[in-house]
């Protein structure tokens, strides 16, 4: 018997399966106790999955992944950077509001390997020249999202950004990322399956393929029970194998 959670987010479907113990542990069986390192890795994985669903549900081809940098001679303190970022987002909101649209974004602030603070965002599609005009502090590096709707690699990139300065050790406080208000958060469909186990190699439903890099099987550090995870992605008509597996960098 196992618990299955299904999340539908945009063009993707996430499947999470977790074995359920039929009988309580006996007095002789040890209670599972994960190490702090295992729990930290597990929590980071959950954060990555949550952000993936948020991106897959709310963004699409033509939206942008951008990096806001600072000129070498004008690198701000953490508080100044926070203020500059807020002013940039206000300008973006005004830009979209004037066009009868609503700004969608997810952002995070991070440090580079050499200690340069910068901002990463996934944002509604906007002309590059307008973006640069709203950011006078340095370069705007913009990359359009592809149309696969499968943005977990972008989520992985966000979650693994440096949160502490290599030079000073100063940490960026708060959440790993900050979303705009009103983004849709896909709810799970939860089912208890009576089968003793699941298929070792999962099969996609009609009209989808399984991203092979998303498949995970192992022991859940929280419960000590087996689990399986994978993500199905909607097939794009006319696309073939490798082309539909393009990756967002």
Question: Residue ranges of each PLM-predicted region?
Answer:
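Right-hand nucleic-acid polymerase module
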Residues: 1-115, 125-249
């Amino acid at each position: 018997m196992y618990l299955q959670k299904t999340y539908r987010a945009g063009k993707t479907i996430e499947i999470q399966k977790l074995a359920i113990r039929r009988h309580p542990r006996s007095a002789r069986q040890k209670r599972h106790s994960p190490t702090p390192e295992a729990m930290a890795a597990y929590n980071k994985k959950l954060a990555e999955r949550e952000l993936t669903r948020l991106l897959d549900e709310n963004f699409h081809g033509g939206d942008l992944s951008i990096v806001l940098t600072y000129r070498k001679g004008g690198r701000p303190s953490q508080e100044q950077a926070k203020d500059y970022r807020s002013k940039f987002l206000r300008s973006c909101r005004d830009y979209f509001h004037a066009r009868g649209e609503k700004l969608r974004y997810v952002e995070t602030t991070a440090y580079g390997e050499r200690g340069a603070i910068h901002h990463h965002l996934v944002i509604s599609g906007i002309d590059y020249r307008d973006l640069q005009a709203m950011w006078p502090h340095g370069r705007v590096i913009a990359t359009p999202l592809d149309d696969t709707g499968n943005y977990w690699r972008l989520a992985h990139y966000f979650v693994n950004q440096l949160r502490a300065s290599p030079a000073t050790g100063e940490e960026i406080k708060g959440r790993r990322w900050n979303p705009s208000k009103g983004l849709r958060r896909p709810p799970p469909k939860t089912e208890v399956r009576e089968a003793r186990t699941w298929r070792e190699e999962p099969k996609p439903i009609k009209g989808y393929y399984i991203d092979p890099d998303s498949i995970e099987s192992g022991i859940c550090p929280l419960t000590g029970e087996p689990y399986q995870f994978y993500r199905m992605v909607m097939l794009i008509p006319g696309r073939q194998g490798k082309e539909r597996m393009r990756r967002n960098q």
